[in-house]
Amino acid sequence: MLERKKPKTAENQKASEENEITQPGGSSAKPALPCLNFEAVLSPAPALIHSTHSLTNSHAHTGSSDCDISCKGMTERIHSINLHNFSNSVLETLNEQRNRGHFCDVTVRIHGSMLRAHRCVLAAGSPFFQDKLLLGYSDIEIPSVVSVQSVQKLIDFMYSGVLRVSQSEALQILTAASILQIKTVIDECTRIVSQNVGDVFPGIQDSGQDTPRGTPESGTSGQSSDTESGYLQSHPQHSVDRIYSALYACSMQNGSGERSFYSGAVVSHHETALGLPRDHHMEDPSWITRIHERSQQMERYLSTTPETTHCRKQPRPVRIQTLVGNIHIKQEMEDDYDYYGQQRVQILERNESEECTEDTDQAEGTESEPKGESFDSGVSSSIGTEPDSVEQQFGAAAPRDGQAEPAQPEQAAEAPAESSAQPNQLEPGASSPERSNESEMDNTVITVSNSSDKGVLQQPSVNTSIGQPLPSTQLYLRQTETLTSNLRMPLTLTSNTQVIGTAGNTYLPALFTTQPAGSGPKPFLFSLPQPLTGQQTQFVTVSQPGLSTFTAQLPAPQPLASSAGHSTASGQGDKKPYECTLCNKTFTAKQNYVKHMFVHTGEKPHQCSICWRSFSLKDYLIKHMVTHTGVRAYQCSICNKRFTQKSSLNVHMRLHRGEKSYECYICKKKFSHKTLLERHVALHSASNGTPPAGTPPGARAGPPGVVACTEGTTYVCSVCPAKFDQIEQFNDHMRMHVSDG
C-alpha cells in the first residue's frame, strides 16, 4: 500500500534551500562539507591560521592562499595565513623579556650566580628542569660540576635555538647538557668532540706530514667548518669511535688483563669505523706508534706483577688533548715498575710514600695539565679527569682483597702536596670536577666511559672501624665555620656539657614524656645527631627546676589568688598536668604541649607555599596566609565589623557583651582582658601603698588614697591625641584600638 507523499511546507522548503550548496557554475549539489583548497591546507608551512571572517578588503600575507566557497546568493572567501617565522618571533620576544627581567618566575643557581628565566621555556627545553618544576620548585640548584658559562649558553640555546661551541669548550657543554638532559645538544657535542679526533686521517692525505693536523702533538685544530665551529645542524650523526674515551675506559680496569689490547684494538677499530682502507706500506703517525709502545710496556709489567695497588706510581692512561704546546706521552722505564713493586710492599712507611710522590712529579712534569683547565680541554673526560687521584682517597680506607691494614694520614696527604709542587697545577676551583665529585659524593666515585655512553658507579667498601674522616677530603670539603653554626638552642637552656653539632643538620629532641608518681626529678637529654666521624652521641643536660607529680592534688581554689599573674576568676580548678620545664608553662592537652615544644627546639615543620616561610605551628601558618589573601573572613554580627583573625573577633565581642572576667584584687576593678588587668596591677605596684604579699584577699590595704592612686594623673593615648583622667576610661579607649587591629 503506497503512502501518499506529503507536500513540502514553506518552512521545510526554506530549510532545504539553506542547506543546498551550489558550485560557482550554478549546478546544484547535495548538502556536504564546505569545499577547501587542499593545496593550501597541505602546504608544508609550519603554521596555518584559518580566518573565517570576510577579508575581501584586506591583503593577505606573502604565501597565503585563497579558497572560495560559493553559496546561494553569496560568496565567502577564506584566507589561509602562513606565518613562517612565528615560532622564532615568539622565542625572540620571550628572550627580550628575560633580558629585561619581565615575567621571570624561575631562578637557576650555580656557583653562587643566579639566572632568571621562564618556567615554560625551561620545562620545554630540558627534562631536568621539567622534573624540578613539576615538583613545585621555583629555585633550582645546578650541580657544581659545570661552569656558569655552560649553563648560560644552554639557556640561551633554549630561547634562540642557536648554540655556538668551540672545540675547546665542546666537552664542557657536553657535560652541562648531560645534566640538563638536552639530547640534541648531547648528540651534537659528542659528534664535535669525536670529529676532533676523526679529522686527523683526512689530514694525512692532504698535508703529507708525519704528524697530522688536529693531533695532540700538532697543537692545532682540524679543518674548519660550520660543523666544527659548533652550529647545530640536523643531519645524520657519523658513527665515529672515540679513541680518548676507549683508552680512558680501559684505564679504569685497575690493572686487569683487559689493558693488554687497549691500544691496537681501539686504533684498528677507529680506522674501520671511519671507512679508511688500511695501507700496510704507509707508516703510522708517531703518536699512534707511541701508543703501541706503551701497550707493550704495560703487557710486560702485567705479566710480571700479580696484582696492583693504588699508588701515584701506577701508569696513567694516555690522554689525547688539543693544547697549545706539544704533549709527550709518558714513557715508563723498567726500574719504575720495580720501584712500584717495592712501594706496594712498604706502603705504610712515610719515607717511601714521599719518595714515590717526588718521582711521580718528576716523571709527569711534561704530561701534567692544570686541574682547573681540565674542563676546557678538547677531548679530556669531564668527570673522571684524574682517576688515580680520585681512587687514592679510597686506597687507604678500603685496601684490596679485604686487607684490614690501617690507613696512614701521611700517605693520603701527599695528593694535596703534589698539586702545590707542580708549577703548572692550579688549585681546584669551584667548577673543578675533583672538588665537585668528592664534596657531593663521599663514598661513590663516578667515572664516565664515553665508548659505551653510560656512567659507571663504583661503590668502595668503606671500613666501618675507621673513626676519622679521610684526610684527603680536607682539600675539597668546605670546613664548617663553627661547630654549632646551625644549632638553635633555647635562651633558657643552660648546661656545662659541651654541645657538639654537625653543620647543616638540625636536631630534634625527643618529646618529653610524663613522669610517674614517686619518681625523682630526672634531667632531660637533648640528643644530638651522631657526627660522621664516629664519635659518641653528645647530650645536653637540662636539670628540672622541680616538676610536681601529676597525681598530686592542686591547692584548693581561692576566691582571689594571692598572685596577680595567676588570679583568674575562671579555670582555677582545672588540672594542667603537662608543664614545660623550660618556661614553666602548663597545658591541659598533650597535643598543645607537643606544639609548644617546637618553640624551644626551633623546629618549623609548617611552610608557606607562596613565600616559603616556615612556622612552628599550623595556626601561625594559617594566620600568615591572610597576609597573602587579605580576606577578612570573621565578621561581627552586631556591628558588621570584619577581622582577619578569629581571636580578634572574640576580643571585639567582649565589648558588646560587656564581659569583664578579670578583676583587680586591690581595687575590685574588672577588666575584659588579662593584659589590661596586668597593666592595671602594674600601676598599683608602682605606688607606695602596695599591700604586702601576705595580705588576705578582699582586705583594704593602706589608706583610702591607695584606691584612688591614679587621681590627678592624665592618661594620653599613644595612637590618637585623646586624654583621660580615669584609668578605666583610658583602658576602654585602648581596647578600641586593639579591636581595630
Curated annotation (Swiss-Prot):
Sumoylated with SUMO1. There is a cross-link at residues 330, 371, 723 (Glycyl lysine isopeptide (Lys-Gly) (interchain with G-Cter in SUMO2)). GO terms for cellular component: cytoplasm; nuclear body; nucleus. Residues 104-167 form the BTB domain. Residues 404-423 have a biased composition (Low complexity). It is found in: Nucleus. It holds the Pfam family BTB. There is a cross-link at residue 330 (Glycyl lysine isopeptide (Lys-Gly) (interchain with G-Cter in SUMO1)). InterPro entries: BTB/POZ_dom, SKP1/BTB/POZ_sf, Znf_C2H2_sf, Znf_C2H2_type, ZnFinger_BTB_dom_contain. Specifically expressed in early hippocampal neurons, cerebellar granule cells and gliogenic progenitors as well as in differentiated glia. Expressed in adult and aged myogenic satellite cells. Residues 354-367 have a biased composition (Acidic residues). GO terms for biological process: cellular response to glucose stimulus; lipid homeostasis; negative regulation of DNA-templated transcription; negative regulation of gene expression; negative regulation of transcription by RNA polymerase II; positive regulation of glycolytic process; positive regulation of interferon-beta production; positive regulation of interleukin-6 production. Residues 1-28, 203-235, 350-440 are annotated as: Disordered. It comes from the Eukaryota. Residues 1-17 have a biased composition (Basic and acidic residues). The modification Phosphoserine is found at residue 353. GO terms for molecular function: DNA binding; DNA-binding transcription repressor activity, RNA polymerase II-specific; transcription cis-regulatory region binding; zinc ion binding. CDD domains: BTB_POZ_ZBTB20_DPZF. SMART domains: BTB, ZnF_C2H2. Can homodimerize. Binds to DNA. May be a transcription factor that may be involved in hematopoiesis, oncogenesis, and immune responses. Plays a role in postnatal myogenesis, may be involved in the regulation of satellite cells self-renewal. PANTHER family: AGAP004733-PA, ZINC FINGER AND BTB DOMAIN CONTAINING 45. This is Zinc finger and BTB domain-containing protein 20.
